[in-house]
Design a protein with these regions (language model features):
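Extended alpha-helical interface modules used as scaffolds for assembling large macromolecular complexes
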Residues: 174-190, 283-617
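Short, amphipathic alpha-helical interface elements at domain boundaries
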Residues: 1-379, 460-480, 485-489, 494, ...
Length: 617
């Protein structure tokens, strides 16, 4: 029997064109009372044997695992046998067993599946009696183990024989409320022009990631200096949340790069004063479609991504919707093992692809380390690492999923068979992610619930506002980075936990768009005591002063040598609404009225040399 990639409509065609006599005789011995000697007679005998109820007999001769594989092909995959999906549902060992059974030729397996597909004339008949396979289910947890053990041979999590001595403690982070605090803090940094990015890449600079790391509520996932014993220096992992935030703001439409500085868009400015969960939902919808950044580029150990203008890379905008669709199967509030989620995605055909040509991607060296070699670019190494980055660096940073993780060192060894990996402690900085859970913010953003309601306890009021205009932080732990930054924008810091407001600080804040009503609301929500009258009066006075002036736009100042002409133009019926007199020798054209003013002035018999060219440039 010789291999072929042809698809045949009938079993007779396969037997006639693809089987030799030596292949047909074992089948005939299993199915026929008499085994003919000639090929044509063998084909007729086998086809006759599987007519009517004979097909059921042939099916009954299969091993149970083969029967399951055939059931998947008949009822789930439209007549195709998908080995990778079968392995994802039944386990890699099941696929190996299936392959070994096929080589034994002790069942009529090859009668049913040829070149990965059923003959067309058998599919309908088999569907009548082959039992439907059980639906695959995503296994979830209500509670996490405190410690886990990674099997050295399989890389799988073990839940037995775990002790305090050999088990690894999970770091668990609840992300929704900290992420909202972080979003507000970073929006304020952008508003102050403090976020710097590469003008071509949009990636945050080193100074910017350091700045953001210092104000993150709860800190980044891996904080240098807090490493457990026997683990690598966290500083080598690099920033994760601090790197992601500027990219999320840009890809989510809240900020744009103006040279090397991020500036808030109209949506970003609105997010400063609107419902933050709604802003996160809008950002995430835009992020799904953005092509401005590819999360896979953060898998630094896999090189060759930028070759040939990235034409071999598939757009991330095609990957994210597939992952988000798979997340629909995750019940909110339940913990999901990452490997289980990855398995489930393969089993249920939530497939996406990172590259068109894996030969261009490599580890360490292009020739020997290419991911094009069999097994070198498998799902867990390529698509699985993208999935880790997507969940850990972007979804968790934005507060959509809670995470439980370990240091990445040695947690995932699926890449150890690849050439050039001996010196790698991990393939990606995200290898430590073990479990995730869709939290209330994630359920809202992903459309599972209609409103966001955090299950985290409300932070206790942490500020006390004094009559002498001091603001004292009574509980620093209850203040987020966003709160501290806001206080610094409205007051002068006079001690470690004390800020002082004054007319000067309030006017300075108002110039940047932080108005007295916003300040009053901020202080009221973070103070357990009534606002002192002195502070209320100061805020009211500042509000009155701020309301006296408003900006209408930039005008053009014109000098006139004739005071009488200034009066004439300023009072003329066609020009009076387009300008105002400034003293008796100046006129100011109103913003947006320049062209109309120059036209009316020309009709009056006067011009301003060169001004029209300047305006029309």
């Amino acid at each position: 029997m010789e291999g072929s990639m042809k698809n045949y409509a009938t079993i007779r065609e396969i037997l006639e064109k693809e089987y030799r006599v030596d292949d047909l005789k074992p089948l005939a011995k299993m199915l026929c009372d008499i085994v003919p000697a000639k090929k044509d007679d063998l084909v007729r005998a086998i086809c006759s044997a599987i007519s009517g109820d004979g097909l059921k007999k042939a099916f009954s001769l299969l091993h149970p695992l083969q029967q399951s594989a055939l059931a998947e092909a008949v009822h789930v995959h439209g007549g195709d046998f998908d080995g990778s999906r079968f392995a994802a549902k039944y386990g890699s060992s099941a696929r190996k067993t299936l392959s070994e059974q096929q080589k034994m030729h002790d069942t009529p397996w090859n009668l049913f599946i040829w070149s990965g597909a059923l003959p067309g004339d058998l599919q309908g008949r088999l569907a009548e009696f082959v039992p439907k396979p059980k639906d695959d289910e995503l296994n979830v947890l209500d509670e996490l183990p405190e410690r886990i053990l990674i099997d050295d041979d399989t890389g799988e999590i073990r839940d037995e024989d775990v002790t305090e001595e050999n088990g690894l403690p999970l770091q668990v982070r609840h992300t929704d409320r900290p992420a909202l605090n972080n979003l507000l803090a970073i929006l304020r940094l952008v508003d102050r022009g403090k976020i710097k990015v590469g003008p071509k890449t949009g990636h945050p600079t080193g100074a910017t990631t350091t700045l953001i790391s210092g104000i993150l509520d709860g800190g980044d996932w891996y904080i240098p200096g807090e490493e457990p014993d026997d683990f690598n220096n966290y500083s080598e992992i690099g920033p994760i949340q601090a790197f992601a935030w500027p990219l999320l703001l840009q890809g989510g439409g809240l900020a744009n790069a103006d040279g090397s500085t991020l500036r808030l868009t109209r949506a970003g400015k609105a997010a400063l004063n609107e419902n933050l969960p709604d802003a996160v939902r809008s950002l995430w919808k835009k992020w799904e479609k953005t092509t401005f950044f590819d999360e896979f580029s953060r898998i630094n150990a896999i090189r060759g991504q930028t070759a040939a203008h990235r034409r071999h890379m598939i757009s991330p905008a095609t990957r994210r919707p597939v992952i988000n669709a798979a997340l629909e199967e995750c019940p909110p509030g339940k913990w999901v093992d990452f490997d289980e989620f990855s398995r489930f995605m393969c089993s249920q055909d939530f497939r996406f692809y990172v590259a068109r040509d894996l030969w261009r991607l490599y580890i360490s060296e292009p020739q020997y380390g290419s991911l094009g070699y069999a097994g070198f670019g498998k799902w867990s190494i390529v698509e699985g690492r993208y999935l880790l980055a997507y969940l850990f660096e972007y979804m968790a940073t934005l507060g959509l999923i809670d995470v439980a993780y370990l240091p990445p060192d040695g947690v995932r060894d699926d890449f150890r068979g690849n050439w050039g990996t001996d010196g790698l402690l991990y393939l990606s900085r995200y290898d430590g992610l073990q479990y995730f859970r869709i939290n209330p913010l994630g359920a809202f953003v992903l459309g599972k619930v209609s409103a966001y309601e955090s299950v985290l306890p409300e932070a206790s009021p942490g500020l006390k506002v004094l009559p002498n205009f001091d603001i004292v932080a009574m509980d620093r732990t209850s203040l987020s980075g966003a709160d501290v930054m806001y206080l610094s924008s409205i007051a002068d810091k006079t001690a470690d936990a004390v800020w002082h407001i004054s007319p000067a600080t309030l006017l300075r804040a108002a110039e940047r768009g932080v108005l007295p009503d916003d300040i009053l609301s901020f202080l009221n929500t973070r103070s357990a005591e009534p606002m002192p009258q002195t502070v209320s009066t100061l805020l009211a006075d500042t509000k009155s002063r701020v309301a006296k002036f408003s900006y209408l736009g930039a005008g053009h100042l014109l000098a006139c040598s004739d005071p009488m002409l200034v009066k004439l133009v300023a009072s003329h019926r066609s020009l009076s609404s387009l300008c105002v007199a400034a003293d008796d020798r100046y006129l100011c054209m109103l913003p947006g009225k320049e062209k109309a003013f120059l036209k009316a002035l020309t009709e009056l018999g006067y011009v301003v040399p060169h001004l029209r060219d300047m305006i029309e440039r």
